[in-house]
């Protein structure tokens, strides 16, 4: 290398050169490759493909052309990069599962949702989609600026004059240097409606825009869970949207069910999804699937998942959601180029940028059309003058030596324009008038006169010239109005948007499931009805309800659990695996637990000690378990009513027990010789019925008690008790507004007739023999409740709640049941419905279920009928109700056993 060569070198600091070069590279990637423009929603490669197809005449109305030719044109004229990058972009624009409105109409294999690659470009054919013409419409009217291509041989548009907000409609995704964009597709109709709202009110709130833009609308359909991610994305430009595939449940015979997946989340590979499900089944992370196959075809997605018998389908589906991409998230980053710079924008800013751009496009188009109209009017004015002075025009032309001389002579003369002055003023063409008010031809007009055909000399053509001038004058006036009035310009903008909506809008594909869907372990727990059994020794278990047989009244029952004589069942209730429960202990402490966390057992199993489940202190044991509504919104209007064996009661807010730490909290203060009998949720308009083991009962309104905020209070006296008597149950009843006289009169109607009236059957008021009105009887029949009373010797009865008069708390009560040595003491009192089932458990562990419709309805002061045949020394220790459940397979198999069950009436 010579010294002269070294003299041309410029020394630079490598650190500075790295900074400058890397920044140049980064900006090139951001501006020229990876980030879309907010105005037309396109990256340079997509814009070049569409413009190249438009320029080549590869329109939607024309035949398809080989994709290879299109790629070659784009690469040779505008995009000097690899052909594969161009073809991949073209393929994506043709995929109806990638774009909400495909911009390319492809013919051939353009890939699939399984991740299959498109056929080679030499095999596929393409043309512009019909909607793509709305992106390039008016591009020939100087609406957008053009820049030289990479070698200066061609010009390409810097942006397309898009007539709809393509950035939102089709979305975009890309990774640049130090930044990325990920914009989901939306519904065209919703986005255009939002644009119209913004045009009407530029100060509109983003939340108001959310009223019409419900959320992304993915081409693959599926569902969006919750709206918090949508709100965050639209308010800040960033957010995470949870997508979930759509699944249906089908019965396929033999008591089997199948999950049919018909829609999958956006950009999820269907083949990989099926493989992932199979992997999870093999690893036993998803259980209950017996067969899996992909039955998708040209009509849509169909993934068939056959389930094993007796599997809870919801649990399997939740496992699939948790372990696979059937539920996934879409991270929204609404980053786009605005004024040439990358910016994260919210929904309103994106819409505002598009509307502002369309204003510029319409303004530029109007200026272009105005200039064209004025140029045309200028020529027509010259032709009109020439026709009016045709003899002189012909003479000048004949006398001229050549066309140029004729043109100069025409331009040099002044022509009388009195007869066309109105037309000159109409088109606002002042260039023709000289100081004397006469007209002189311009060079353009003179040339047009020389090129005029002889047919223009007819009277019809003269009238047509004047008509054309008037039409042009109308157009010019309209263009000037548009340019002079932003209101008019916005009207046109809205009209054009609405036309696009009417032509291309389609119904929403993606549904929005409102509410929050933070999936936790509970979503993977089978929702199943369980019988919870608690023993005196502190053991607890849950057993599937289907494990017990339904028997008729008087049946001998079956063994429910095997226990020692000193360990008897104290509480039984039925609930879902997702039922929240409050555990109240003998020392007034309360704990919280979900039912599915209890040990699963069988009817003969003993369960587990509660001390191993709850953090109980020494000498502490659970005395009462209170199941609650699964929906905590239902807790707002509920109170908790405490009742103790000594007759004390206390009313508290249920919300005071909403948040309970794992180590529990104080619920109520108890005297040493007292114990907690029951705790129930109640409302202010309801009544409380306290019942004692000696057959007494007291009814009073909940509202007669004030809410006690102190959790350390022992409450107030609820019922005055006789010596050796104690409260054994507390029942919550509906409040009633009828008088005692009306209730007594109503109770004279036979109970069979009252039940018929409650079922809607017609009745004859005179035949009933009461003084009540028909409306009163109907109202009381529909509101009537029945109280079930059960004794330790297996006797029971149902009585109308209307027979229990309302008194003040603190009294001794009234007779609830006539008890004697035969019946034994009362062990349970509760409200029941006609379709309920009764569950009884004895101190020997024997259990029976019977339909309450077979239990006689009598007055309060009766002894009832035998419900349960007891062995010597056997006593009923627990009573519980089971709501009517759907008939299971096991119930069907026991139909014969139920019919043969013994019935005993006394």
From Swiss-Prot:
According to the entry, every stretch annotated as the Topo IIA-type catalytic domain falls at 35-524
Where is region (Disordered) located?
Answer: 886-906
Q: Where is the active site?
A: 123
A GO biological process of this protein is: DNA-templated DNA replication
Q: Does the keyword Ribonucleoprotein apply?
A: no
- Keyword Transmembrane helix carried by entry: no
Q: Which NCBIfam families match?
A: gyrA, PRK05560.1, PRK05561.1
Q: What does the record note on quaternary structure? A: Heterotetramer, composed of two GyrA and two GyrB chains. In the heterotetramer, GyrA contains the active site tyrosine that forms a transient covalent intermediate with DNA, while GyrB binds cofactors and catalyzes ATP hydrolysis.
PANTHER family from the entry?
DNA GYRASE SUBUNIT A, CHLOROPLASTIC_MITOCHONDRIAL (PTHR43493:SF5), DNA GYRASE/TOPOISOMERASE SUBUNIT A (PTHR43493)
Q: What does this protein do?
A: A type II topoisomerase that negatively supercoils closed circular double-stranded (ds) DNA in an ATP-dependent manner to modulate DNA topology and maintain chromosomes in an underwound state. Negative supercoiling favors strand separation, and DNA replication, transcription, recombination and repair, all of which involve strand separation. Also able to catalyze the interconversion of other topological isomers of dsDNA rings, including catenanes and knotted rings. Type II topoisomerases break and join 2 DNA strands simultaneously in an ATP-dependent manner.
Q: What else is known?
A: Few gyrases are as efficient as E.coli at forming negative supercoils. Not all organisms have 2 type II topoisomerases; in organisms with a single type II topoisomerase this enzyme also has to decatenate newly replicated chromosomes.
Please identify the protein, giving its name as recorded.
Answer: DNA gyrase subunit A
- Gene for this protein? gyrA
